[in-house]
């Protein structure tokens, strides 16, 4: 049983904690918060020991009715693996602690590739991650791109990918971010960071990405165009999506053509937090003509990396020998079936 510490119990951390707790081969030994808030009370309700970075704030936690188990360093000492889910650019500052303690650690996509020297996706490079001390799980957008690009590459060969990311402005609980009434190019320059990030996992893929931010909180939307080496076949593309455990197919019969409807569907399915771990690829958008493949896919920014974190833990602790086995273990423990099989 692998002992896992969650350093940063926020949007991603709380989801990873619940996903880890659901597994049969790992357990949560603690989570960390910087201040008492609603998420800290959820951690208490879940039975996760609560640790804090600054022990001078212990009184504030205890006044709020939250028992403090110790410092973040205490938590890390007790763990086999540390999932760093602190905000972007904060995680890298925690690396010296993990190194000092000789612990395995994994970071999120908000950190640069260099923090770990290895960027991870369960479907693409699981075997290369086995036994590593440090791993970076790529961002939500990069995760979604890697999953589908890798499958298309295996089936038809990829000559070039052009992807446009229409990104949500903020997560639902982020009240200090926007925009409220604007479409913001982020960045104005081409490529956006997503293309080079894909290449940290799939270095042989030629890819150009562009990105913008829009006033919504639900999900990201990708418009993807792939030039293939072999002539592409629409039916075969649909089949490879259906056969992948982390790719969902939004069928015409569902009548869904927006991220809002997707999230409503996830709620009706009874998904915890209405989370969508899978790429949500719109079947009607799949266009194949000679060597050109186009489609839309929606990516739930709060959720798709959660299952990847669990698989990364298995890889670095050698609990599984390949990605297929780990993905099945993770999905089964979460009772997760891609949405293509629900309508």
UniProtKB/Swiss-Prot annotation:
Record-level GO BP terms: glycolytic process; lysine biosynthetic process via diaminopimelate
PROSITE patterns xref list: GAPDH (PS00071)
Disulfide bonds: none
GO CC annotation terms, alphabetical: cytoplasm
Compartments (UniProt record): Cytoplasm
Pathway: Carbohydrate degradation; glycolysis; pyruvate from D-glyceraldehyde 3-phosphate: step 1/5
Keyword field: Cytoplasm, Glycolysis, NAD, NADP, Oxidoreductase
Assembly, per entry: Homotetramer.
Name this protein carries in UniProt: Glyceraldehyde-3-phosphate dehydrogenase
């Amino acid at each position: 049983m692998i002992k896992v510490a969650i350093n940063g119990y926020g949007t991603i951390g709380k989801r990873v904690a619940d996903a880890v707790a659901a597994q049969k081969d790992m357990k949560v030994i603690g989570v960390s918060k910087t201040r008492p808030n609603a998420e800290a009370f959820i951690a208490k309700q879940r039975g996760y020991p609560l640790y804090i970075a600054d022990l001078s704030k212990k009184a504030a936690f205890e006044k709020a009715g939250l028992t403090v188990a110790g410092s973040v360093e205490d938590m890390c000492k007790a763990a086999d693996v540390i999932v760093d889910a602190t905000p972007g650019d904060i995680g890298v500052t925690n690396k010296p602690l993990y190194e000092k303690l000789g612990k395995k650690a994994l970071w999120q996509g908000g950190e640069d590739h260099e923090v770990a020297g290895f960027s991870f996706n369960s479907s693409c490079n699981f075997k290369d991650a086995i036994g590593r001390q440090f791993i970076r799980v790529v961002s939500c957008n990069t995760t979604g791109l890697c999953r589908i690009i890798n499958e298309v590459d295996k089936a038809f060969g990829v000559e070039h990918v052009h992807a446009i990311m229409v990104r949500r402005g903020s997560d639902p609980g982020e009240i200090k971010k926007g925009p409220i009434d604007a479409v913001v190019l982020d960045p104005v320059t081409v490529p956006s960071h997503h293309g080079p990030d894909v290449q940290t996992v799939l270095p042989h893929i030629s890819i150009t990405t562009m990105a913008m931010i829009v006033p919504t909180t639900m999900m990201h939307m990708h418009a993807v165009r792939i030039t293939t080496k072999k002539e592409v076949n629409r039916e075969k593309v649909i089949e490879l999506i259906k056969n992948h455990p982390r790719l969902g197919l939004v069928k015409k019969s569902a009548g869904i053509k927006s991220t809002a409807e997707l999230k409503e569907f996830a709620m009706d399915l009874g998904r915890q937090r209405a989370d969508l771990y899978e790429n949500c690829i719109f079947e009607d958008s799949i266009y194949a003509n000679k060597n050109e493949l186009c489609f839309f896919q929606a990516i739930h920014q709060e959720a798709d990396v959660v299952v990847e974190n669990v698989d990364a833990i298995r890889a670095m602790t050698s609990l599984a020998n390949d990605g297929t086995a780990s993905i099945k273990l993770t999905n089964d423990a979460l009772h997760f079936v891609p949405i293509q099989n629900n309508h």
